[in-house]
UniProtKB/Swiss-Prot annotation:
Post-translational modification: Is synthesized initially as an inactive proenzyme, which is activated by self-cleavage at a specific serine bond to produce a beta-subunit with a hydroxyl group at its C-terminus and an alpha-subunit with a pyruvoyl group at its N-terminus.
PANTHER family cross-referenced by the UniProt entry: ASPARTATE 1-DECARBOXYLASE
Uppermost EC category: lyase
Cofactor comment: Binds 1 pyruvoyl group covalently per subunit.
Official protein name in the record: Aspartate 1-decarboxylase
EC number: 4.1.1.11
Record's keyword terms, sorted: Autocatalytic cleavage, Cytoplasm, Decarboxylase, Lyase, Pantothenate biosynthesis, Pyruvate, Schiff base, Zymogen
Source organism of the structure: Laribacter hongkongensis (strain HLHK9)
Main location: cytoplasm
Pathway(s) where this gene product acts: Cofactor biosynthesis; (R)-pantothenate biosynthesis; beta-alanine from L-aspartate: step 1/1
Family under the similarity heading: Belongs to the PanD family.
Amino acid sequence: MQRTLLKSKLHRVHVTQCELHYIGSCAIDEDLLEAADICEYEEIQIWNVNNGERFATYAIRGERGSGMISVNGSAARRAAVGDILIIATFARFDEQERLEHRPRLVHVDEQNRIIELPAGIPVQAAP
């Protein structure tokens, strides 16, 4: 049996631009793509923390070191400059791979510079 698990996550990145008439996709700073192990043209899920929108598109390379997160094409209607996003990818794993898998997590500051690469997601405590 295969299961679909979180492969990588850019946590709380900030939208730097929205280009409605660009040919589509989401441009992401190459440093962030590499840190999260997201490849060009890979499907990504985007969750907008500000407005609750959730949508899928694909990643393209943004200028390295720029902190760019550009939501493009029709998806630009689902985000605004300054919005906080979670960008995630998923992959299928068999049972043995699942036991060994750890997602690539990338935490950033307000300029989308990498501040932490945590080893996992901690157990959530009850209130």
